[in-house]
């Protein structure tokens, strides 16, 4: 069962240079920043804000290094102001973007929710992402995980949002089990999950301790983007 670091996510069309390591990599693995009003370093997750882009690898260690080593000012050749806890800000913005993406996908018909519907999507091979509420009951999740692990191409697993957050995003109540159906929308959403995974675990640590089968084996989700 994958979560977030083994199957490659869809990559962007262009490459950029990480201002911390100097490595050239795909845009999908980077976060873009621009100098905002007052020279404040501003995250541009959609890559649409005007101004020269300052690109940093999408992980907490790289972003913290950029902030602490004055890399933004050096790259911009101008004095910039780094907001306090920039990594925390980016994490929150990425999560907000992921939840908004789920809402858009539901309106487009690319999501299905509820245990039976998710089970059917997994069995049919149409489930690209199995989205489970972080605070959902173990029993239903375990059954779906066991079903997913039996598929020739298991869906990836996302469990970084609770039932209330999922419900607000989808306009539903008590959202515990959701399937993101395979297609271009799931691929685009996966690109944002890739970036988010550099800042936050995609499943609660406690899930890895849950028994997932009659023989007592445990849920040990693999990362989906290594």
What would you call each of these model-derived segments?
Residues 180-226:
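C-terminal functional extensions of proteins
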Residues 1-3, 14-20, 24, 39, ...:
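Catalytic cores of RNA-modifying enzymes
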Residues 8, 17-20, 126, 142-155:
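Short helix-coil boundary/hinge micro-motifs
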Residues 61-140:
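Extended interfacial segments that mediate partner engagement and assembly in macromolecular machines
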Residues 1-70, 74, 78:
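N-terminal cysteine/histidine-rich coordination modules
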Residues 25, 61-63, 135-138, 164-165, ...:
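Conserved nucleotide-binding/hydrolysis micro-motifs of P-loop NTPases
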Residues 52-53, 108-109, 127-129, 152-156, ...:
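Short active-site oxyanion
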Residues 152-197:
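Short basic, glycine-rich beta-strand/loop surfaces that mediate nucleic-acid
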């Amino acid at each position: 069962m994958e979560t977030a670091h083994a199957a490659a996510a869809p990559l962007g069309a262009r490459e950029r240079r990480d201002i911390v390591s100097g490595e050239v990599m795909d845009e999908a693995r980077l976060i873009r920043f621009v100098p905002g009003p007052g020279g404040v370093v501003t995250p541009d997750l959609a890559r649409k804000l005007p101004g020269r882009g300052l690109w940093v690898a999408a992980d907490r260690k790289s972003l913290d290094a950029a902030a602490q080593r004055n890399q933004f000012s050096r790259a911009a050749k101008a004095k910039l102001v780094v907001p306090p806890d920039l990594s925390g800000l980016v994490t929150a913005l990425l999560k907000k973007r992921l939840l908004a993406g789920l809402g858009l996908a539901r309106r487009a018909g690319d999501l299905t929710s509820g245990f039976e519907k998710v089970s059917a999507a997994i069995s049919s091979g149409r489930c690209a992402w199995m989205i489970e509420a972080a605070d959902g009951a173990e029993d239903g999740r375990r059954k779906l995980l066991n079903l997913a692990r039996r598929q020739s191409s298991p869906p990836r697993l996302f469990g970084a949002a609770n039932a209330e957050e999922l419900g607000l995003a989808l306009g539903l109540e008590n959202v515990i089990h959701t399937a993101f159906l395979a297609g271009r929308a799931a691929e685009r959403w996966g690109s944002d999950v890739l970036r988010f995974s550099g800042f936050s675990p995609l499943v609660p640590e406690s899930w890895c301790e849950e028994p997932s089968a009659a023989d007592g084996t445990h849920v040990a989700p693999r990362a989906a983007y290594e």
